[in-house]
């Protein structure tokens, strides 16, 4: 009852699809990230990011801005758990590949001169560690007490989204690393990595979808949209995490498979092949 009373203190009472609530924390964070990227790009002499890389990075920042402000943000925070799952999947599965694809390796390499980064980066970007960090973060924040805490306190919600984003970038690193010093998994390793990545997310999703009770009661206190009950909303949210989330990784596996075949036919560069790790298991050595 206390949680419900606190939730009712939130200002949103009606959802306006054309309303944009701009959050300063989001604007500041994205502005700083964009400034650092384009400042570094301008300082490069003849080796700046390609047009495609600039577009990819900018698209990642723009997508983050869209999902963390405006109608989807309000839908996620005040009305529907299923809306929050859409927001989180975009943050975890679409934004990080855009940011990584848009960042050339030379732009990141100077950070490896810092002793802490040089020591830490090779340890947290291996397949097993990236897998563990992402899935521990996923499970941690979907515990009902912590999830509800993030909904009630904006600063906690900021921490939740930051940890999701960082963990997701790490999760994608063994598949997309632009740095030979922190190489990708081999193609077979990438396929295995994508497969096992579906398992913890599926377990969490099935638990949420099949729960007998409403795990996140704050949504039960919000105005109902489109006649969706809190229990049905939770079921839909679990299915969104389970089915699109799982299918996404199978889609990535398909892309990796065809890239692997291209390498066998001489279509991929030797440098990329040399930059791959031997296997998913070997990545932890």
Regions picked out by a protein language model, each given a short descriptive name:
Residues 1-285:
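Alpha-helical membrane segments of multi-pass proteins
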